[in-house]
Amino acid sequence: MIYPKTYDVIVVGGGHAGTEAALAAARMGAQTLLLTHNIETLGQMSCNPSIGGIGKGHLVRELDALGGAMALATDKSGIQFRRLNASKGAAVRATRAQADRILYKAAIREMLENQENLDLFQQAVEDVTLDGDRISGVITAMGVEFKARAVVLTAGTFLSGKIHIGLENYEGGRAGDPAAKSLGGRLRELKLPQGRLKTGTPPRIDGRTIDFSQLTEQPGDTPVPVMSVRGNAEMHPRQVSCWITHTNTQTHDIIRSGFDRSPMFTGKIEGVGPRYCPSIEDKINRFADKDSHQIFLEPEGLTTHEYYPNGISTSLPFDIQIALVRSMKGLENAHILRPGYAIEYDYFDPRNLKASLETKTIQGLFFAGQINGTTGYEEAAAQGLLAGANAVQYVREQDPLLLRREQAYLGVLVDDLITKGVNEPYRMFTSRAEYRLQLREDNADMRLTEDGYKIGLVGEEQWRMFNEKREAIEREIQRLKTTWYTPQKLAEDEQIRVFGQKLSREANLHDLLRRPNLDYAALMTLEGAMPSENLSAEVIEQVEIQVKYQGYIDRQNEEIDSRRDIETLKLPDDIDYSKVKGLSAEVQQKLNQHKPETVGQASRISGVTPAAVALLMVHLKRGFKDAK
């Protein structure tokens, strides 16, 4: 049957990408349908119970700046919060939280069920329908056809998923859930370029069988950080600690003894795993000189005894899993609640996507999450929001939301995917960004909220809070510039106490704050330096960073401006690169294959040299002259 209601946007999949995509589309006013094989697993944390970290926390803040759900759900479910790299530069400081799985899933479910313009329906999707080269809807397992002008596919690890434990394997999307075999086969029929990747998860341990007296405690930070601009510490549940143990030479010998039954080493697994989150057997094989690896025991929640041993993801046989776990200090009597496993799944070459995450071959079809070759909740959620928003923009025939590399980590992520592709699961790091001083956690809202508000992603209350913060920052920076001190105005002992030396000339608070050995708090101890208004910690942090890093930021802005012409210059859809004089055969082939949208994208394709970019620019200018 054909369902009687036609939707603007259909989202397939209810993981981190799918939930953000559906919420984004519905927030923008589009009639949206979220299809999932099981409503009970919406927003489920399939692997580790944590959100954020270096690079990933930056993505979460960007999501939040655009009205996304992940940061707020984390504030409602986080049972341990830490600020990483707190003593380092502002660019690499990041927030990470352990989340209660049950509370996190409940927070996402509540947002979904209370979101206007959003319908939920429980059915696996087995087919997509096309009208020529345009998407027109989907068909579910029981034959219901849902019509829509745009479809966002966020199938995660479910497309033709295969689970491995030792030499045993079976079809599945994750433990306990079926694979989307029919949909995977249908997408292959559409000739979309694809490959196989793999990821894995560790065995889970019953906390009642852990001897915590032998472990090192790792408490959260005090005061407790907050993840969302719409959140606060009062939202947080009870806070708990993580614990640290280590592998040892006995552990490593046990792991090696299972190599002959490892699906990774016996060729049973074809997919490539994540480089920066390798299985324990891969670590022992690659780093044979190391006698020990640190393992974090992370609580899964407040109402369960289950612990996640971060660092021993494995697909080794279950008897080896038991032995390796029990070889570690504090885990001698550990009971495993769930075995670790590896999962192989289909992904589609993201070089077949536009910067909007729409496929180049099928109009109105958008991909987000692990289907694009990424790994991680945060990477998936960020893509989901962007794809959901751009699906609405596509339906409305409006310009897509495109984020530049110097504007957002999400811009870096998408640009990397569509220009370089992936040969292993892609994870976000701060080192991937050329302009990371611009892309800090603390200024995500200043970079993105206005763009989100313009297209309806950001609500009125968040917009009001954003403007109050922005205006407070501007007022305080202006006040610092207009508050002056002379050597005669301050007592000599006060000058030495605050500045470490006597003032040699008149200076304002703005210039004084730029001194490397002086922070805002110390400066405010000067007589008459305190502002008349109460400023939040977030405003003070922004003010201090903007003042201290202004010189570096200005230099980066000059560099960005110098490249803007190249970055934004559009390439014609029908350009034939074999006719561009001077380009090598390799460059012509790659450009014709990948069809970059801008010269900037072309410049980042492997093998495209600066000389080739210069030839492209000449060709385009000649074309413009001929057109005139």
Swiss-Prot record:
Extract one GO molecular function annotation from the record: flavin adenine dinucleotide binding
Q: Which UniProt keywords apply?
A: Cytoplasm, FAD, Flavoprotein, NAD, tRNA processing
Instruction: Output the GO biological process annotations, alphabetical, semicolon-separated.
Output: tRNA methylation; tRNA wobble uridine modification
One GO term of the cellular component aspect?
Answer: cytosol
| Domain of life (superkingdom) | Bacteria
What are the names of the required cofactors?
Answer: FAD
Give the location in the cell: Cytoplasm
Q: What does the entry list as the binding residues for NAD(+)? A: 273-287
Which SUPFAM superfamilies did the record assign? FAD/NAD(P)-binding domain
Positions that bind FAD: G13, G14, G15, H16, A17, G18
Extract the Pfam families matched here: GIDA (PF01134), GIDA_C_1st (PF21680), SAM_GIDA_C (PF13932)
Q: Quaternary structure?
A: Homodimer. Heterotetramer of two MnmE and two MnmG subunits.
Q: What family is this protein classified in?
A: Belongs to the MnmG family.
The record's function comment reads: NAD-binding protein involved in the addition of a carboxymethylaminomethyl (cmnm) group at the wobble position (U34) of certain tRNAs, forming tRNA-cmnm(5)s(2)U34.
What is this protein identified as? tRNA uridine 5-carboxymethylaminomethyl modification enzyme MnmG
Which gene is transcribed and translated to give this protein? mnmG
